[in-house]
Structure formats: C-alpha cells, structure tokens
Amino acid sequence: MYLAMPVILYRLAFRGLRNRGYFSRWLERFGWFRDPSFESSIWVHAVSVGEFNAAIPLIQELMRRHPDLPMVVTTITPTGSDRVLKQFGARVFHVYLPYDLPAAIERFFARIKPRIAVVMETEIWPNLYFACREHQIPIFIANARLSERSMRGYGPAMSLITEAVRCASLVAAQSQIDAERFLQLGAARDRVCVVGNIKFDMAVPDGLHEIAREWRQAWGALRPVWIAASTHEGEESAVLQAHARILGRFPDALMILVPRHPERFRAAISLCRSYGFRTSCRSEDQIAALDSQCFVVDTMGELLKFYMCADACFVGGSLDRIGGHNVLEPAALCKPILIGPYTFNFAEITDTLVGENAAIRVANGAELGTQVIRVLSDGKRALAMGRAALAVVERERGAVPRTMLAIEAILSDSPTSARH
C-alpha cells in the first residue's frame, strides 16, 4: 500500500480541485488528529451522505443504550462529514477514516480504541479489517449490500478481499441476493444473515408537510412540479430535454434539479440556462420565483424537503450507468417515482416498486418526459402510485431493531476494551 502513496496523494489533490473540502483536514486521512483520550468507544463508519443517513437511527439507538461509551463516526467524503456535524455536532467524535495504510490505521485505533466497528454497506478495506482482527475488534457490516458490478470490480484483488471479509464477525445483509454474494466472496455462512434494508425504517421529519405547503404556495400553488434528484453529469442533458417536452404540455411546470455532487452545482445551473430555461437556485434565491422553469438545489441536506414538494420524482444515477440512488426516500413520502434503466445498486427494491406499480422505468430522456407528463396529467394515477410506494416501505420496515439485536449480541460478547 505504501507504494501507492503517490497515487493516493494525486487522487486527493485531484478531488480537491473539484471539491475544496478535500483540501481540509488532510492529516486525519493519515491517522493524525487530536487524541480524544477514550478508554473505549463505539465506532460507526459511513462513506458518505447516503450511508450516513441510513446509519442515523443505529447511531441514535446505540447512543441511547450506551451513554457511557463515546460514539465515533467516520466518513470519507467532505459532504458526509458536513452531514455528520450538522446532525450530531459535538455529541459524536467525528474524523475522516484514514487511508488503508497500516501505520495510519494503528494511529487511528490508538486514539479511538473501538470496542466494535459498525461498517455501513460495502466498505471493505483489507488492512483495516486485518487490523481489527489483530486487535480483536469485532466488525459488524450493517445494511450490507454487494452488487454484481462490485463483485467484478474486485478482479485481481479478490483473494485479498475474501480474506478481509472473513474477518467480519457478522454481515447483516439487506437481501438474500446480497447475502449470497457475500457468501460467494468468502464470508462464513454462520456469519451472514438477512435483516432487511435499514433505509425502509426512515422516519419522516416533523414539519416536512408544512414546509412543502409553504413553498408550493410561494412557487404558485397550482403549477405542476417535478424533481430530478441525485443527477449526474451524463444524464442532466437528458433530464433537461425531458423538461422541455413537459413544458410543451404544461407551460408553467417547474423542475427542481438536485445534482448528486456539490462540484456539479455551478455546471448544472449553467447547463439549465444554456437550454434557455429561466433558472434560479437555492443558494441565491432561496425559493423558486413564480416565473422560474428550473430551480437548482445547490445546497446539501435538503433533498427530503424538495421531494415532499414534488408531484413526481425522478431518482437519478439511473439514466447513466451509475446504478441508481435511494428510491426509498420518495417512496416513504408517498410520491410517484420514475427511474432509468440502470438501477443495479438497488435492483431488488426498484424491481419491487416497478412490479407493484409504484414506480415507472424509462429508457431515456424522451420517455422520461412522456411519463412525467402522464403522471402530472392523472392525479388519481399519481396518488395510487404514491400509496403503492408507501405500502412497500411500510411492509418492509423493521431492519433497525433486527440490526440492533445483532449488534448488541456482539457487544455483549466483546471485551470491555479492545487490545491495543
């Protein structure tokens, strides 16, 4: 891994050029940070915003059950870091996860002294896992998922990944398909279980309906509104072409565009204007003007508010080969959902929603425009789709208590403090 140091530094610098947040707190990524002087702690790792949002109920419940143990939360991305600090502030100890370098990991462990490592979804770092095994720190992979694309991506490193996965005390998989893939990866059968997807347990924040009602009134209460959320560079042109088609049917329609990554914000605003759309943005205008045709959300942490405002919700990362993003947020808000053809990151969930007439799968931007028009034109159909989506969410709830039961079983068997 040390031979890869030039590549690591280059990637960090490259990302910093796109997102200035990567230029901050470099030392944390090498295990250098203020020693909190913990005797023991509970450590939860979530790579970025989506994984952290899923981890919130687990973190809250762990803090409630173990008030005597400090809570450590790590992320990799600056946006994930911002979300942690906004949600918990000083109630948790937050740093970036160090690079997968033995010395950096040793410094990290020496400072936080974790009693357990709760790793969200698909974060498998060989040196980190080997160090956990060496220090007798149980690894719990929560909300575990593994796509076919991820399996293929391990390639020549497969044997190393297999050895790392075997270090896990328990893999709590989202689905039977995910469980089978972890078994194929080499996880021990008695250390893999299916608990469901924690994201089904999302709680709708208080006051969300009131905020949406106020904003819709300010935008023009009767105008149709749709949202294109978590979009990527390769699909935003298709989304804007869809909106042009929608405006042909609904001249007063408003599209809310929410780029997935902050470094895309300014480019997305420019792209909307290049199509000739009257465009406003959240950071400058706060709310969409009555004559706005596009409203770009160039802030973080507000996606649920804008989902609640929409009459139809397109979830991005699915028109391009990204694999899709979280469709359960609009589903939990009783919204009709549209997705593209590439949803392999959430294959089982999206197939269920489509199969139960809660979501519509489209092939391209032209079809997206056509289907959004149909949803906006038929209030009864939109309501039925939203209710079907919510029914799927309600039926699948319960992963958080099942996950907590498994974590508590491991904690009760683990030593009071790990060996450092």
Q: What is each residue range found by the language model?
A:
Residues 1-420:
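Nucleotide-activated sugar donor-binding and catalytic core shared by glycosyltransferases
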